[in-house]
Regions:
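Short, polar/flexible loop-turn hinges at active-site or ligand-entry regions and domain interfaces
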Residues: 27-36, 57, 154-157, 178-179, ...
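Extended, charge-rich alpha-helical segments
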Residues: 272, 279-380
Length: 380
C-alpha cells in the first residue's frame, strides 16, 4: 500500500488529466492555437486508451491488444497522426498492465524496445513539458510517475542522464514523505537512458535528505539567476526546467518549511523551441548575428527537420540558414548574410536562455564574442 499524504494525492490528481492532454498534443499546436485543439485531441486519445485498456484487462493477448489499438487509431482517431496515437495508447496500456502483471511479458518487453525506437512520439516527449505535468497518476491503476524530458534542444544531451535522474530524485524527495513506500511505482524517463531508471531514481530519493535536496536545488536556482554554476563547474542541470521567471518561487519553496503547500504550477516553465527561435529572430532582425562556437569539429552542425540530415559544409550552412545545435527536434533559422548588420548586447534581453552557445557581436566594426546567456522571458 502506498502511503502518501492527502494533499500530495490532490496535487498529483489535479494535474493528471492536464498532463495527459499536454503530453498528447502535437508540437505545432502547443502555445499556438490555445488549448482547444489540444484538449479535443487529448480527450479523444485518452478515451480511446481507456476503451483499449478495459478490453485488455479481460485477458486479451498482446497481439490482440496491438491489433485493437491499430483498429482504434484507424477508426476513432483517424484524423490524428497514427504513430502519435498508437504509441501513446500502447505505452499507457502496457504500463498499466505491467504494474498489475496482467500482460504478456513478451509483449511488454517488445513494447519497451519500441518506446526507445519511437521515443519522439511516446506521450509527446518531443516537446518540453511543463513541470506541473511531470508527475501524474491514473487513479484506478496506482501511481505512474512520468518524468518528461527535462532537457531542451539547447542542452548537451550526451552527459545529462545522471543529472536528469538526480534532479528527479531531488523533486521527489521534497514532494513525498521520507517514509514513502515506492513499491508499485514506475518512473519512466523518455530520454534514451536506462531501463533501470526507476530503481536508480528511487535509490537517489531514499538517500537524499530534505536539507540536502533544498541545498542542491538552491544551488540550481543560483545558477539560473547568475548564469554561473554555484557548484564550481558548468552545471548540467537544465536551467530551463524552472526558468528565470520562476527563480524567486523556487527559492521561496526551497526555504519554506511547509512543503505540503507547494503549488506545482508555481514552478511552471513553458518552453517551446519554435517560440525561442521566433523571439531570437525578432530580436536579431536586420542585425549582425552568427554563431561563433562550432564545437569540436570546427563546423556548424545543421539538420533538416525531416530525416535529420547533417551538413558540415559551411557554405551549405549559409545557404540553408538553419543552425540546429545539439537538439533533436525542430530547426533554427538565421538571417541571410546580406541582412547582417549590427547586433548589440541590449538585444540579448529579449532572447531565451541558451547555454553553451557563443555569439559574435559587431559593435562599430569591432567583433566581440559574448556568452549567450540572455534572460529567459515568456515570449508568448
Amino acid at each position: 500500500m502506498i502511503k502518501i499524504s492527502a494533499s500530495a494525492v490532490h496535487r498529483i490528481k489535479k494535474c493528471a488529466h492536464s498532463a495527459f492532454l499536454e503530453s498528447s498534443m502535437p508540437r505545432e499546436w502547443q502555445y499556438r492555437d490555445g488549448y482547444k485543439q489540444q484538449a479535443e485531441r487529448g480527450t479523444a486519445i485518452h478515451a480511446a486508451a481507456e476503451d483499449v485498456l478495459n478490453a485488455a484487462i479481460t485477458g486479451l493477448s498482446g497481439a490482440k491488444i496491438t491489433a485493437l489499438i491499430k483498429k482504434v487509431c484507424k477508426t476513432k482517431l483517424k484524423e490524428y497522426a497514427f504513430d502519435d496515437c498508437f504509441y501513446t495508447i500502447k505505452t499507457y496500456v502496457s504500463y498499466v498492465l505491467k504494474t498489475h502483471k496482467q500482460a504478456d511479458k513478451n509483449w511488454i518487453d517488445t513494447d519497451i524496445a519500441v518506446e526507445e525506437k519511437h521515443r519522439k512520439t511516446i506521450l509527446g516527449c518531443d516537446m518540453v513539458a511543463k513541470l506541473d505535468a511531470s508527475i501524474f497518476c491514473f487513479a484506478n491503476f496506482g501511481f505512474y510517475i512520468h518524468i518528461f524530458d527535462l532537457k531542451t534542444g539547447y542542452i548537451d544531451y550526451e552527459a545529462t542522464a545522471y543529472d536528469q535522474l538526480r534532479f528527479t530524485a531531488l523533486l521527489l524527495s521534497l514532494l513525498f514523505p521520507k517514509n514513502m513506500d515506492f513499491k508499485g511505482f514506475t518512473i519512466h524517463t523518455v530520454q534514451p537512458l536506462y531501463y533501470d531508471a526507476t530503481k536508480q531514481i528511487i535509490t537517489h530519493t531514499e538517500q537524499i535528505t530534505t536539507k540536502q535536496a533544498r541545498k542542491e536545488l538552491a544551488e540550481l536556482a543560483e545558477f539560473v539567476k547568475t548564469g554561473k554554476c554555484a557548484m564550481g563547474s558548468h552545471c548540467r542541470f537544465c536551467p530551463c526546467v524552472l526558468g528565470c521567471k520562476s527563480v524567486n518561487d523556487l527559492v521561496d519553496f526551497i526555504n519554506s518549511n511547509e512543503v505540503e503547500n507547494m503549488d506545482m504550477s508555481r514552478l511552471e516553465y513553458v518552453y517551446d523551441s519554435r517560440d525561442a527561435i521566433d523571439a531570437f529572430m525578432r530580436a536579431c532582425e536586420g542585425k549582425l548575428i552568427e554563431f561563433a562556437d562550432r564545437g569540436e569539429s570546427g563546423k556548424y552542425e545543421v539538420r533538416e527537420k525531416s530525416g535529420h540530415k547533417k551538413w558540415k559544409d559551411e557554405k551549405a550552412v549559409e545557404k540553408s540558414l538553419r543552425i540546429f545545435g545539439d537538439g533533436i527536434y525542430g530547426k533554427r533559422k538565421l538571417l541571410s548574410p546580406a541582412k547582417m548588420e549590427k547586433f548589440t548586447s541590449d538585444d540579448l534581453s529579449a532572447l531565451y536562455e541558451t547555454p553553451k552557445v557563443k555569439i559574435l557581436v559587431k559593435k562599430e566594426n569591432v567583433f566581440e564574442v559574448l556568452d549567450f546567456h540572455p534572460i529567459a522571458t515568456d515570449q508568448r
